[in-house]
Amino acid sequence: MRDMDSTARGLGDLLARHEQAGAPKVLSCRPLTGGYSRVMTHAVVAWPDGREQALVLRSDPPPEEIVYKTDRVAEWNVLRVLTEASAVAMPPALYFDDGSHLGAPTIVLGCCDGPSLQAASTDAAADLDSFAEQVADTLAGIHSVDLALFDGALTPPGDWESYVNGLIDEWALAERAHPESVPVLRYLSAWLRAHRPAPMDMVLVHGDFQASNLLVKDGLQAIDWEFAHVGDPREDLGWFSLFSASISAPNLYARDPESFLARYRARTGASAEAVNQATVGYFSVIAATRVYLSILQSAAAMAQGKAQGVMLTYNLNACALGNFNWLSICQSLEGAL
């Protein structure tokens, strides 16, 4: 766990470097729970004019505890563009440290004090229909961001067919690289290739769009952009549907998937041929590629004595459950694609 005294000193040094005319004083730092793969810290600073501001620090964990290997510089570049363009409702990205001050690459963001959508939707008084509409609208907004804004911060992957084939190939390649045989990966790769749906235009994809990464404050605010990339919009739809089915909170997609997708199509102009329950089901498998294979790589590293941590062990359960779920999805979609 990060030492809060050294974090406070490092944050103070970082702010002093950026705010030379009047740097704030760091009043407090405390660990934030809920961060799944990053080290999260809540800080409060006081500015010379008397104003207090809450900040959130999002840092890399020690190398041996990394569950998902993602790039803080790449994430910062995406967040910086989105913040400067006010393109998506989200906590603003304010500062970046390459590790010189805080000991690890760290993004400093404004703090949104709203609850997660996952927590808010369990309230007995929650308007779940309204939440579902807001989710569809938020996702449509992300997918409508002009890719030209990124100008090198995100690299377009090329044509749709090559991109999707590349994602499909990752399943078989991961099986070959794994220390033991995982035949389900070969099966998924072959099934996905044989059942590809119609292509769509490439868009900004959040990459981990789920209820716990949406904060309820003046609508919905999207957080945790470490998997952001240019890809097929149905990746986010598929991941949201898959994740929503695996948590105890109300499933905002499954309560009325036709209405959810109709609202999304109305906001984006997508066709019913391209965006429907079958294609979302297909992409619920595709969307899991990066997360699942990262867990698999971490599991292999742990078995080889190269990694450790409670989260790595915990995530092994996700591998077994994922295999069962994806095979079930493939079976249910036979004849629909």
Positions of predicted regions on the chain:
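An alpha-helical support segment within catalytic cores of ATP-dependent transferases
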Residues: 7-23, 133, 144-207, 269-272, ...
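ATP-binding pocket architecture of kinase catalytic cores
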Residues: 30-166, 173-183, 199
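Conserved N-terminal boundary motif of the eukaryotic protein kinase catalytic domain
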Residues: 24-30
